[in-house]
Every structure is written in C-alpha cells, then in structure tokens.
C-alpha cells in the first residue's frame, strides 16, 4: 500500500462516480426518483447516489477527526437531498475536500489507526490506508447496482 496507489484509486473513484452521475442526470429527475425494486441497497438511482455521497462524507469527516455531520445507520445518512443539482453541488465540494486531504497524505499516515464504532455499536480499529481503500470499494459495489438500476429505468421508460 502506498500514497500513490491510494491517490490513483481515488482518482478512479471520482471519475467513475461522475460518469454515472452524468448518466443519471441525462435521464432526468423523474427517472432518478423512480423506484426500481427492493433488491437494491436503495430504491431509486438518486437515493443510491445520496448513499454513496453520504458514505464518502462520513468517512472523510471521521478521518479528519470531526464528528460526522451525517447520520450513520440510515442508508441515506439522514440527508435530505431532493434534486440532482443539490447533490452535484454538495458532491463537488466534497470531492475538493477529499482531493485536498489526499494531497496532504504521507506514507506514515496510512498506518495510523482510526478507531470508531459501527452503527450496531461494534468497536473497530483499522489503519487509515485500509479505510482509504474501503471507501472506493464500497462505492464500486453501489456503482454496479446503479448500472443495473439504470438499465431497468431506461427499459421501463
């Protein structure tokens, strides 16, 4: 694990998120809000994007030592984001913060422990580098769900 690897992985994470966000935006707000099934982590494409944004926000604030402003354990992190424009504005600001955080990383930071608790109260301690790899991996799962959702929305329209 290296800072260079982490930065490259996050560059891909940001690129892939933006690509899918652009597809959802091109389909429009009605499609973004269309429920496509309970088999997904979130019921609508917009809710899936909000979940992904919320997870990124939660972890950045945790790594910065700030109490997260989002509600952990709620799939959309307690966020009330009703439009793609609102989400894009927030996500752009978050990406800028993430890039700044990643720019300041040095190799030794990757091994610093991050302590916390799951929504169920289970205590954990993991090296920062492992958590920096976890977040884009978490998003990859949801991006794959979102691709299937978008196929269903497009076919169902």
Predicted regions mapped to residue ranges:
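A structural signal for well-ordered alpha-helical scaffolds and beta->alpha junctions
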Residues: 6, 17, 84, 91-95, ...
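Short, contiguous alpha-helical
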Residues: 7-76, 118-157
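Basic/polar N-terminal segments that are highly enriched at the extreme N-terminus
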Residues: 1-4
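Helix-adjacent hinge/juxtasegments
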Residues: 66-110
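Carboxylate-rich helix-loop segments that flank metal/cofactor sites and access channels
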Residues: 107-120
């Amino acid at each position: 694990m290296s800072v260079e690897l982490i930065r490259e992985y996050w560059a891909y994470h940001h690129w892939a998120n933006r690509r899918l966000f652009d597809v959802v935006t091109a389909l429009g707000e009605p499609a973004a809000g269309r429920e496509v099934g309970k088999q997904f982590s979130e019921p609508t494409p917009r809710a899936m994007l909000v979940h992904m944004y919320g997870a990124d926000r939660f972890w950045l604030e945790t790594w910065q030592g700030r109490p997260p402003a989002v509600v952990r354990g709620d799939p959309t992190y307690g966020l009330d984001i009703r439009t793609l424009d609102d989400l894009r504005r927030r996500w752009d600001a978050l990406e800028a913060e993430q890039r700044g955080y990643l720019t300041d990383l040095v190799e030794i930071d990757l091994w610093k422990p991050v302590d916390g608790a799951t929504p169920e109260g289970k205590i954990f301690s993991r090296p920062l580098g492992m958590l920096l790899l976890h977040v884009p991996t978490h998003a990859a799962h949801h991006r794959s769900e979102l691709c299937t959702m978008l196929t269903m929305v497009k076919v169902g329209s």
